[in-house]
From Swiss-Prot:
ATP binds at residues 80-87. This is Putative helicase 022L. It comes from Invertebrate iridescent virus 6. A motif (DEAH box) lies at residues 213-216. Its EC number is 3.6.4.-. SMART domains: DEXDc. InterPro entries: Helicase_ATP-bd, P-loop_NTPase, SNF2_N. Residues 510-588 form the Helicase C-terminal domain. Belongs to the IIV-6 022L family. SNF2/RAD54 helicase subfamily. Transmembrane segments: none annotated. Residues 67-273 form the Helicase ATP-binding domain.
Amino acid sequence: MEFKLEDFFPLYPESLSNNSKTRFEIGSLDVINTLKEFTDNRLDAIEILPTKPGEATKHQIVIRRLLSGYTQFDALLLVHEMGTGKTCSAIQAIEQNLIESNNGLFLRTVQTTEGIDDFNFNKNCNNNYGPGLDGAVILTRGKTLMNNFMDELVNRCSTNYSSGNRNEISKTSKKLFSKFYSFYTFEIFAKTVKKMRSSEIVKKFDNKIIVIDEAHNLRLSDVKVNDEKIDVYGEVHRFIHLLTNKKVLLLTGTPMKDGPQEIASLMNLILPLTQQMPTNKNFLKEYFPSTEAPQETYELGDEEEFLKSGGEEMKNIKKFKAQVYGCVSFLKAMDSKVLKVMVGERMGSLKHYKVVPEYMSTFQSKAYVSAYLQDKRERGIYNNSRQASRFVFPDGTYGAEGFKNYIIEKRGRGGKIFRLSPSLRKEIEKRSSFKSVHTLTDEQKEFLYLQNINEYSAEYAYIIKSILNATRNGELSIVYNDSVRGSGLIVLTLLLELFGFVRNNGTAKMKKSYGIFSNETTSVREIRALQKIFNSDENMNGNIMPVIFGSRVIAEGLTFKNVIHEHVVPHWNGSETEQVIARGWRLGSHEALIKKWEQNGQVGKKPQLNVYRHVVIPSSLLSSEVSRREDDLSLVTSSSRGIMENREIKSIDLIMYEVSEKKDIAISKVLRCLKEVAIDCQLFKKRNEKDSSFDYKRECEYEKCLYVCDDNGNNLTKKNIVNYETIYFREDVFLMFAMLENHYKTRFVSTLDEITEMFFNNKVLTHSVTKQEIIQLLYQVVSNNIPIKNVYGYPCYLYENYNVYYLVDHIIPFPSSEDIFLAYYSKHPQLYVKTDSQESGKASGTNYYQSVTWFNNVLNDYYESLIPLAIKDLTTLSNSTNLVSKTQMISKQLISLPNDVQQRIIEMAVAARVLEIYCNVQNTLPPLPAQLSKEWIERNQKSVFCKKKTFRTIILDHYKNYYRIDGVDSFKMAIVWFLSDIVEERAKERCLYGSSLNLKSGYTARPLWNEWKICGKKERVRVEKERSLIKKQYETDLGYYGLWNPKNNEFCIRDIRNQTGKKDKRSIPSGKRCVNWTKPALTELAAIAINIPIPNQSVLPTLKEAMEEIKSNKELRNIVPKDNNDNNLLIKLVFWYKLSRNDICINLREWFDRNNLLVEDNSCGVQTKRK
């Protein structure tokens, strides 16, 4: 084979010079779609997420390889939705660089489903410095996000820094990661680098990965830090562009919040200074020329022009894509299995958003109109109107003024304490037609309080009533409000306390409590504690904390589980609103509720998330035609009721949503460009592309969901493996080596075909292994004399002879073809050899075999010593009077014994069965055959297997598939093959021959169970036939049968439909773990092939529900028979598909067992399988 020099070096697209107009040549990155290290990790719509700390998802592997020290990708904007694991993506990239730099000298931990031990493969490699960077600088918006990042680093995304305590970050962990990771908040970092000279910055921070978490929070504006104005964005921008050797990773799920122009400031952080994008108004003129999108603090009147314009149309798309080419990764989250319902109706100019309207009382409307007109006169921001729409205090004030008059604020031991003033409390508790509030029932008091609250806030009355109803129904709620003081969250939570709720600071599990998440009221430690309480399974039905209230703190970095109701007080930015909603709606967020619902037989409504976007509308003050009942607190509203006839007075909430929707459409145009031009577009397309039911909705950027990647790889069909074999084979080699070592735990000699088959059938590696990779691994192990621990735990070395790989217990300087016989001594180690000089008084020339103490003999003696103890324990269990209980206890105890001990117990039980005609508990011996001595019979009668027939019967029944006896009365032979069924190795079948009963002189004291010998070739052939007969019992027309391994309680399914006539063992399918079958395959097996009866018909979906599910699910559509006319089959398919794989497997195992199609098999669930 001819090699070229480039075959030994990794090849990636080269970046262009900084004088070029683009970072990479357009089209050059299409090669990414052909590289094995990336294509092996192409995403599907659904991925089973790893459960062990440190294990990476497929997209995280892609990101860490893109940012490897071997590539020229030195900056990426990660536009990854909430719930995709952006933090772990960053940590994986950092750890990859640390390993490549060899600065960390990490031990690689190898974990597989077989429980393989750690092995530091690096110790056999050269520790030269590699291309990776040697540290990381992490910038976050605040301490909460910083702590979240640290927690992910220690407890989830890596195993290199954990101290074992998952509840907090220990000093030990901080000491470990502080060697490589530096953490700063935006403001502190900007203040730090502002004081440093350029040369100092380069010296301290060069050769590092820079990660900016929630990067969209870096704004083009000054920020006050200790009364000092600092241009945070400018300092970070200067810092990044000073460094010469760095990689930059910007993390964000929402790169734009206030308008599409914000993408420019983000991209300029990572684009060279000569390729900077225009910002603010200049960006809008270039790409959205029809309007200037308003900022969050725009003045009154601006919204009219914006709403009338066509500002959501984007121009010069090709130019924009060229500027960001090679710098963007785009990923959407996997869809949650829980339905998200937008409650309400469309109002005003809204085309997509649904809102829930509430109508102000005359009192609140009067104050709101005053606030609105004041905002209009002052040409300021809408702060007064927004405060008045939330809550108006009894004296007509709102916001800061009303808060000062009616809210009592004190500083307590645990922080600030707030409570309602007596005057405000009195107004809420004032009686109506009732004599005294103290004589009211709880229902009457609730109605009275809500009626009075509605006078001051229609929105808060609605929210509180919803919370009360949800709490009674065992449902969790979240309330988001960006205003904390004034008429904001503090007032709302204090009003809720009138209904028996108490504030929880995270220190105790108080019933009917609430948590408040804001920087003004709650510390970072309290926020973490409150989140843990709220997300606990104990709280899934609100038994402790049924509701939490949050400001902007909850919009980023936090996840909330089992939420049923989310209330959103209006905000200018659709992106921020969506961030809040995503906190309680992501894959797995409702897992506990769904599981409970399924366990209860799917009775009642399936859990779903209800989202309420609240809009408060002022009542008419100018027309006597508009009337409304002041005591109407119904949660059912109508958009035609109570609308202001004075067109100058508008609902600020509705305006905010109208502006938000229009901005969101413009932002989505940019997001669509980023998705299509992303460097990983083709790799992530199956995940990012939704089905047509989402056409023209926000999920598909308000366009058709079907899209085409700019780099689609259509012209590149050949998979390129050069980079993978040069670099990334090193990553998988650790895991592959562990699998190889595990393979040799059950053998000392193995062929290349057997090793290849083992890797091809693996369920551990994330990609399919090639034969070249296997040979490369074997070559490295053999040529570098890398030790492999054998079954005894001794280090051995692997050698090869004509594709046969064998273990020897020492290094062979010059291997030869005859060395293969040395494997015998690895399998049978010598512990001690006696020399002639030590044999004083004995003749020299002693037989070598007799002079050696063999390891196997010592091991067998040890197992023999265990047998009496094991039998004693088993016979104790057999004293139970209940036969079923006795059998179950003995079977459970047998499984826990070493395999060799189990083999000996079977042999003793079989021998006792052979002697049954001679066993007599009453010591009344039957007539003896002439050749048997009385002493021999008495010795055998002492066996517990003879004395206790029931015990022996249980033993033999338990192992019924592992022995055979040819005739008892005229005994010929018995065979036991328990060990050979576990380890596919010769000389494991053991035979008891009829000749053993023909005793010779001198053997009269030897029990029959000591007469077992290794079977000959003829008997081994007989064993193979017996195995085939056992399997044939289960090979019915169905084409499947179940396997159960009692040792590890694994359940496998064997598919024998295409087995007929196959002689080559490699082509015979072995049993596959049930949980490793795909969901569609299990569904088809349960619903079509087997058609398992469903006992509880009430849990089945309706035909309409089934049709809708199949229509929206491609996997289900693919398993529906083409000629199907059976509606019941469609219902069954959906029913089984909705269950977890584990639940389907439980049902399948029970069915196989009931129908006598479940066979015990010790190879189920292990890598080494007999066929």
